[in-house]
Amino acid sequence: MKIGVIGSGSFGTALGSLLADKGYEVTLWCRNDSQIESINRNHINNKHLPDFTLPEKLTASKDLRTVVQGKDMIVSSPPSHALTEILREIKEYLPEKVPIVSASKGIENGTLRLVSEIFESELPGKYHSYLSYLSGPSFAKEIIQKVPTIVSIASRSETTARKVQEIFSFLYFRTYWTPDVIGVEVGGSLKNVIALAAGVSDGLGFGQNTRAALITRGLNEITKIGLKLGADPMTFLGPSGMGDLILTCCGGQSRNRTVGFRLGKGETLEQILSGMNEVAEGIKTTQSAYELSQKLGIEMAITNEVYKMLYEDKNPKEVVKDLMKRDLKREGVLV
């Protein structure tokens, strides 16, 4: 089996490494010449994962057509804000009747489209039943280190979901399939917003009580907007919901939590982003999530406060104070 992976960041590389580890021939799309040379000659992604040796069956190419054309499966893992442009470029030579697996997380700025809506808008209908979406608690470095990991595979086609499930499942990588595309996407996108808040809390020196509160109320917000969009509430108790939320809010490898932590320590967003090698999706997603909550008429207190902190320069200490001063609520209802 020949597989093309679009995106050479840490997660795309990790998924490509997993698939190559299973014996598949994997071609990774990279824009950077030195990165391509490093992967092909030394089997190291020198830009994103310099400490890990990649399988020999994983190679890299700058030619997007070469990566995509004639492959038996496509894995798409670019930042969500770059997805529309990439799909418009590849659709003329995208193979038909092969699984297309998206691992991108986010809500498109401006259009407020989920990743699945971008795929279904940009690709002809003949591709739609072959689309699937991978999400769950999975740091790239730990996948490469072969740490036992679980994720969700969502597709509106059970045939596609089960096929992708079989292709990805391995000794250290277990997959669960679900038809709930919306739930998997909402959980995978909005957990990054909550992780920013959790990072701020840690940066301000608050304890684990506060982090647990943010995770709990954050899950409430994710579930509310998910239900409004038609998701199955049980999805948010699975790998792509609670699982990913806990990992992203607590794990030291979380880029979004790290951005929040540094904001809590007093750095500006501009200072933080200037030194980052990878995208923290939660920054752009916060804007889209805020606008979507306003459009749908849903109260999302944590999301609103993170938005004010990122885009209106609100002091992180004031964010926490205002969250704690909110009107008292009844537990057990999505409010």
Curated annotation (Swiss-Prot):
Q: Which InterPro entries match?
A: 6-PGluconate_DH-like_C_sf (IPR008927), 6PGD_dom2 (IPR013328), G3P_DH_NAD-dep (IPR006168), G3P_DH_NAD-dep_C (IPR006109), G3P_DH_NAD-dep_N (IPR011128), NAD(P)-bd_dom_sf (IPR036291)
The UniProt keyword set, sorted, is:
Cytoplasm, Lipid biosynthesis, Lipid metabolism, NAD, NADP, Nucleotide-binding, Oxidoreductase, Phospholipid biosynthesis, Phospholipid metabolism
PROSITE patterns from the UniProt entry: NAD_G3PDH (PS00957)
The UniProt record lists the EC number as: 1.1.1.94
Question: What pathway does the annotation place this protein in?
Answer: Membrane lipid metabolism; glycerophospholipid metabolism
Query: Which reaction(s) does the protein catalyse, per the Swiss-Prot or TrEMBL entry?
Result: sn-glycerol 3-phosphate + NAD(+) = dihydroxyacetone phosphate + NADH + H(+); sn-glycerol 3-phosphate + NADP(+) = dihydroxyacetone phosphate + NADPH + H(+)
Please give a single GO biological process term from the UniProt record: carbohydrate metabolic process
Q: Where in the cell is it found?
A: Cytoplasm
Instruction: Quote the record's binding site residues for NADPH.
Output: 10-11, 31, 105, 140, 255, 279, 281
The entry assigns this protein to a family as follows:
Belongs to the NAD-dependent glycerol-3-phosphate dehydrogenase family.
Summarize the protein's role: Catalyzes the reduction of the glycolytic intermediate dihydroxyacetone phosphate (DHAP) to sn-glycerol 3-phosphate (G3P), the key precursor for phospholipid synthesis.
Name it: Glycerol-3-phosphate dehydrogenase [NAD(P)+]
* UniProt organism field: Leptospira borgpetersenii serovar Hardjo-bovis (strain L550)
Gene expressing this chain = gpsA
